[in-house]
Amino acid sequence: MKALWAVLLVTLLTGCLAEGEPEVTDQLEWQSNQPWEQALNRFWDYLRWVQTLSDQVQEELQSSQVTQELTALMEDTMTEVKAYKKELEEQLGPVAEETRARLGKEVQAAQARLGADMEDLRNRLGQYRNEVHTMLGQSTEEIRARLSTHLRKMRKRLMRDAEDLQKRLAVYKAGAREGAERGVSAIRERLGPLVEQGRQRTANLGAGAAQPLRDRAQAFGDRIRGRLEEVGNQARDRLEEVREHMEEVRSKMEEQTQQIRLQAEIFQARLKGWFEPIVEDMHRQWANLMEKIQASVATNPIITPVAQENQ
């Protein structure tokens, strides 16, 4: 009976908490243009799924699956925020050092708050897992009710700090754009007089020095043409010399080839003259040997063992 009253009390408390603190359904009000915003939206979607506390969520909460996923999403978000902040720092350009330091501190503080919120959320989920494990099969409705309330509060705080970080980064980006525009203006102011002087000098050259430049260019062109003709003649002469040399080399090679062929034929004839008598003599000796063997066999027949036994 006491257990039944405890369940009813927990149900009433859960209903009161739900009525006193409605479900957060607000969305982050910006377009996910930057990589850090896209990473934060992935974290936000996963948190929304965890907040449902469905059977699958509760099952994964009892293991380390949820905290591992949240840790990975947190690290991705913080990494993208740092990368975007570094990119904006490189674009600040000639902004005053005081302004740079102030903007950097504001962004860093907002970034730290968001990171602390994420860390607090992960720790709270780990605490829930430990509490569930210590219940040893008892009812966990009260623990889930407290977790649901805490998740709603954490989601509000995360939204507030995320929007604050987005605003700080927007101010930082505006400062970077302003610094870049100032840098371009300063460069334009410095280069403006130089460009004007160059334009005037070009106009003066066009008005008073055009003819000397044309004469000089004509003379230079004549020298170039003469030099090219000279180089062409030298190249033709050199090519003719190379062709004659190659023809001479070819003739010598043909002559040497003919001599080698004749020497080979002479050597072949000598070898033939050396070995033919020897081969003929060996043939004669072999024929004589065979005749002697045949004659010996004919005069002395071989007596087989069978014949001896018959005798």
Swiss-Prot record:
Query: Pfam families, from UniProt?
Result: Apolipoprotein (PF01442)
- Extract the ranges annotated as region (Homooligomerization): 258-311
Residue numbers bearing the Phosphoserine modification: 139
Give the region (Specificity for association with VLDL) as residue ranges: 270-282
Task: Give the region (Lipid-binding and lipoprotein association) as residue ranges.
Answer: 202-282
Which BP terms in the Gene Ontology apply to this protein? amyloid precursor protein metabolic process; artery development; artery morphogenesis; cellular response to lipoprotein particle stimulus; cholesterol catabolic process; cholesterol efflux; cholesterol homeostasis; cholesterol metabolic process
Question: Looking at the UniProt record for this protein, which Gene Ontology cellular component terms does it annotate, in alphabetical order?
Answer: chylomicron remnant; cytosol; endoplasmic reticulum; extracellular exosome; extracellular matrix; extracellular region; extracellular space; glutamatergic synapse
Q: What is its main location?
A: secreted
Q: How is it modified after translation?
A: APOE exists as multiple glycosylated and sialylated glycoforms within cells and in plasma. The extent of glycosylation and sialylation are tissue and context specific. Glycated in plasma VLDL.
sequence repeat spans: 72-93, 94-115, 116-137, 138-159, 160-181, 182-203, 204-225, 226-247
Q: Where does the signal sequence lie?
A: 1-18
What sections of the protein cross the membrane?
none
Localization, UniProt: Secreted; Secreted, Extracellular space; Secreted, Extracellular space, Extracellular matrix; Extracellular vesicle
Q: How does it assemble?
A: Homotetramer. May interact with ABCA1; functionally associated with ABCA1 in the biogenesis of HDLs. May interact with APP/A4 amyloid-beta peptide; the interaction is extremely stable in vitro but its physiological significance is unclear. May interact with MAPT. May interact with MAP2. In the cerebrospinal fluid, interacts with secreted SORL1. Interacts with PMEL; this allows the loading of PMEL luminal fragment on ILVs to induce fibril nucleation.
User: What does this chain do?
Assistant: APOE is an apolipoprotein, a protein associating with lipid particles, that mainly functions in lipoprotein-mediated lipid transport between organs via the plasma and interstitial fluids. APOE is a core component of plasma lipoproteins and is involved in their production, conversion and clearance. Apolipoproteins are amphipathic molecules that interact both with lipids of the lipoprotein particle core and the aqueous environment of the plasma.
Q: What is this protein called?
A: Apolipoprotein E
Which species expresses this protein natively? Mus musculus
Quick one: which gene encodes this? Apoe
